[in-house]
Amino acid sequence: MTRTLRILTGAVSALAFAAAAHAADPELTVFDWAGWEIDGALTPYVEKNGAKPTYVFFADDDEAFQKVSSGFKADVVHPCPGAVPRYREAGLIEPWDTSKVEAFAKLDPKLFESKFIKDDGGVWFLPFDFAYTAIAYNLNDVPEGDVQSLEVFKDPKYAGRISISDNSDDVWALAFLATGVTSWDDVTDEQVDAAAAWLREVAPNVRSWWSDPSELAQMMASGEILVAWSWNDPVAILKADNFPVGFNRAPKEGSTSFFCGFVNMKDGPGKEDKVYDWVNSMYAPSSAAPIVEAIGYANVNPDAMATIPEDAQKAAFVDKIDTTLFLQTPMKPELRDRLVEEFELIKSGF
């Protein structure tokens, strides 16, 4: 995949990254999604501290939480908001000092409406990146008309050529949208049952439940998968390789948008000041283009996104769209447990 070093300019940046190539900063451990060690987003951090942070990676939120709750020590973690209630209940995180977050005043207050994200105790989660889960498809082999509805996942024509995210939130957002539900905030038992029934009809068509963006990109590039419920990043990987991939974010039922962000780990092993150096580096306007280019995700800092031309945002599928959007907000822990358990049963054929 094309990376972002060409965006970096200036002798200071070049020297900083030359030093970083030899050693990671031991005073900051970042626990992040695979693929998120993006050099262009770390320029301000490296210029100030001389080296990139120490990175450790995870594949999904469940894996990340299990690791930190079992004793793994990190300074900052990059979960999506659905995982935040578990971090709080386990006493693993502490509120952010928002006065040290340079972009904080620019962030949309609507992102902080959940009591799990912000309450009287402070801000527990800093929203950072957002993207979509929508229909990725092979432009050569799948007619555009076939992907105008989520029912494509039930189409026998694509049996065994479909892949769906092995992520409970993504899967249930898909199933709820397909059955006419656009939020899980007040979902009923009947609506859960209807969504589960829809998923059970889809499951026999699924060749793989993908868990890694590069894995999905490889399966689509090989022709093994023709239609997928995908994040932006597999599409970005395929487009960087000039593969003919489409990404329909506006089927008739809608698509889903998710955002992820940062939690400040209590008793992290590194230096707290460097946690904020890293956060500010990620929010920096100079970081937006490298992240969009590398993995196709947008930055919730409007000043950062303003640095990216509209046509480039459209090409990366991070421009605003006019469609029904199922926003993946934090859900009640008891609902999450129920949906995770039901999803495991569905994947197992029950």
Residue ranges and their predicted role:
Residues 136-141, 176-180, 259-271, 279, ...:
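A bilobed periplasmic-binding-protein/Venus flytrap-type ligand-binding module shared by bacterial periplasmic
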Residues 24-87:
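Early extracytoplasmic/lumenal segment of secretory-pathway proteins
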Residues 88-95, 119-123, 238-250, 313:
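Ligand-binding "clamshell"
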Residues 289-350:
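C-terminal capping/gating helix-and-loop segments adjacent to ligand/active sites or protein-protein/ligand interfaces
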Residues 78-84, 88-207, 211-217:
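Extracytoplasmic ligand-binding site segments that recognize negatively charged/polar headgroups
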Residues 83-88, 221, 227-244:
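A ligand-binding cleft/hinge motif common to bilobed small-molecule-binding domains
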Residues 41, 158-169, 192-202, 241-266, 281-305:
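Periplasmic-binding protein-like
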